[in-house]
A protein has these predicted regions:
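Short active-site neighborhood of thiol/selenol oxidoreductases, capturing the structured segment around
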Residues: 72-100
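N-terminal Sec-pathway targeting helices
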Residues: 8-22
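N-terminal "domain-start" segment that seeds a small globular fold
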Residues: 16, 24-27, 37-73
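N-terminal Lys/Arg-rich, disordered targeting/topogenic segments
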Residues: 1-9
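Thiol-/selenol-based redox modules, centered on thioredoxin-like
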Residues: 159-207
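Structural signal for membrane-spanning alpha-helices in multi-pass inner-membrane proteins
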Residues: 29-33
Length: 207
């Protein structure tokens, strides 16, 4: 008969082993991207701008453009491509949404490991356009509730949500633990974004 103390120690070791198995690949991915020497697979550099150190983003339940709101942890569990838009979604905005959609679809069997999020100001997007062209998009209304999140995005105004929305459009990459880790400036290519995501997904088993 196994003594209770021995059984408890075995269970603890098993739980520790499972935790290491789950988180070690993501830790490795972070080390390779943020660690000394800035090593990259195949000697290639990432296309996005690294956020050093990665920034934990707040858990917030935010209102959707239509009815309802997000779960407070909606930026966790998956890799997230976040785009922020103020005013009407003109050609440059539509092209950015198109790029992120195509990048996600090009991941093939890993498509479901990535989600797309839009934070939009008043008058941004036509509901029919979003339904027809971007049915997978999580479209969030930029209210004051989003200000703590927007304030943590690099190169954005630290004041109101409206002021932050007025900055140049970028795509932000968030890891499955809710950390902002990379920024794609306006004009960056979708191909580079895709290559970065493929490498990260290959190195990480979570999300």
């Amino acid at each position: 008969m196994i003594q209770p103390g021995v059984r408890d120690r075995r269970q603890r070791r098993l739980l520790i082993g499972l935790a290491l198995l789950f988180f070690a690949p993501l830790a490795l991915a972070f080390y390779l991207y943020y660690g000394p020497g800035t090593w990259r697979p195949g000697g290639r550099v990432n296309s996005g701008d690294l956020v050093r150190p990665a920034r934990p983003l707040p858990a917030l339940a935010l209102p959707l453009l239509e009815a309802g709101s997000t779960d407070a942890n909606f930026l966790k569990r998956k890799w997230t491509l976040l785009y922020v838009q103020s005013g009407a979604c003109a050609d440059s905005c539509r092209m950015r949404l198109y790029d992120t959609r195509q990048v996600r679809l090009a991941l093939d069997r890993d498509t479901n490991r990535v989600q797309r999020v839009l934070i939009a100001g008043d008058g941004c997007c036509d509901a029919q356009f979003l339904h027809e062209q971007h049915p997978d998009l999580i479209a969030i209304r930029a209210t004051p509730a989003a200000a703590p999140l927007l304030a943590l995005l690099p190169d954005r105004d630290q004041g109101s949500a409206a002021a932050s929305l007025a900055q140049a459009p970028r795509v932000y990459l968030i890891d499955p633990l809710g950390n902002l880790m990379m920024v794609y400036p306006a004009g960056s290519k979708a191909k580079g974004m895709l290559e970065d995501l493929k490498r990260l997904l290959r190195l990480s088993s979570i999300g």
